A protein has these predicted regions:
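Hydrophobic alpha-helical targeting segments used for export or membrane insertion
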Residues: 3-12
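N-terminal capping segment at the start of a domain
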Residues: 11-44, 56, 99-100, 180, ...
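A non-catalytic alpha/beta surface segment that caps or lines the substrate-entry region
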Residues: 23-84
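Sec-exported extracytoplasmic/periplasmic mature domains
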Residues: 26-34, 50, 54-58, 121-131, ...
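Active-site-adjacent substrate-binding region
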Residues: 34-37, 62, 176, 185-283
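Structural recognition of the beta-strand scaffold that forms the well-ordered cores
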Residues: 62, 80, 91-95, 137-140, ...
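Acidic/histidine-rich catalytic neighborhood of metal-dependent amide-processing enzymes
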Residues: 75, 102-207, 211, 215, ...
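Proline/glycine-enriched tight loop/beta-turn segments at coil->beta junctions
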Residues: 85-91
Length: 283
């Protein structure tokens, strides 16, 4: 119990980390929008993430692959930042997609942008304490968004499906997969979709209480199609942590209204503290 408490205390996400995440998101959105999957702009976004992740001291890998889409074969890029500490320990995997929804004019500041910046900031925090925690992997996935109106077997989640194969090929023993999505909303309310691991959902709520944010995380009655589904289908324990109430009636989602002005440093702080608390519990 004492070791777990020390781990939770060491992985602290503070106001300066929230400010860093907010700044990183703004720079990412301003520099790399649009960043639709399978496009040149998407490749530019991947390079931007690679550069920032490489500065954290992680073992960084770029995974370029091709996958079928409704528009034919397309080139996708996943990024992995690994913090290995103990070869016998299991891994906790944090996931964020970075691509934008095609043909919508959506800048993806919250949807794809906010958690891209958050993961980079979390990488800095994890790097500082890497000798005191278990194995952590951060994954930025391409191709989460579908090109059409609805997801289909060859439209959407190409990046998360590829990440599953990466974990299998590398024989990573995984404790949990936490998929982060749309967590910069100034009016932050984090939901856990019903089609996720029930134990991880309870851990998320417990972690929220431990950081003094009892009502921050709420279970959903409905299932949501997000990156966590690919990991669940492969037998991994996974959940999505998502704010699916972005604007009145979720009106800003996948629209030109998804801008950095809708985001809040305080929301980054809450989300970052929640994730670090969950890492402290899981590791």
């Amino acid at each position: 119990m004492m070791v777990a408490a020390l781990l939770a205390a060491s992985l602290a996400f503070g106001p300066e980390d929230a400010a860093f995440a907010e700044k990183a998101t703004r720079e990412f959105v301003e520099t790399c929008t649009p960043r639709d999957a399978g496009t040149i702009r998407g490749g530019i976004a991947a390079n931007w993430i690679l550069d920032r992740a490489s500065m954290t001291g992680a073992d960084v890998r770029r995974d370029v692959f091709q996958a079928m889409t409704p528009k034919g074969m397309r080139r996708f890029v996943n990024l992995y930042a690994e913090f290995p500490t103990n070869p016998t320990s299991r891994w906790v995997v944090l996931v964020s997609h970075y691509d934008t929804k095609p043909d919508t004019g959506c800048p993806g500041a919250n949807d794809g942008g906010s958690t891209t910046g958050l993961l980079i900031s979390l990488a800095n925090v994890i790097s500082e304490w890497r000798e005191q925690h278990g194995n952590v992997m951060l994954v930025w996935t391409d191709g989460e968004e579908c090109m059409g109106e609805r997801y289909s077997p060859d439209d959407g989640f190409q990046g998360s499906q590829r990440a599953v194969r990466y974990l299998q090929e590398k024989k990573r023993q995984v404790q949990a997969v936490l998929c982060l999505d749309m967590l910069g909303d100034a009016d932050l309310s984090i939901s856990v979709p019903a089609n996720g691991d029930a134990t991880l959902a309870k851990i998320a709520q417990h972690a929220a209480r431990r950081i003094g944010e009892k009502g921050l995380v709420k279970p959903m009655k409905d299932a949501v199609k997000d990156d966590h589904v690919a990991f669940m289908d492969a037998g991994y324990r996974a959940i999505a942590l998502i704010d699916f109430d972005y604007g009145p009636g979720n009106a800003w989602w996948h629209t030109p209204e998804d801008t950095c002005e809708k985001l809040s440093r305080d929301s980054y702080l809450k989300a970052g503290r929640l994730v670090c608390e969950m890492l402290g519990i899981l590791l």
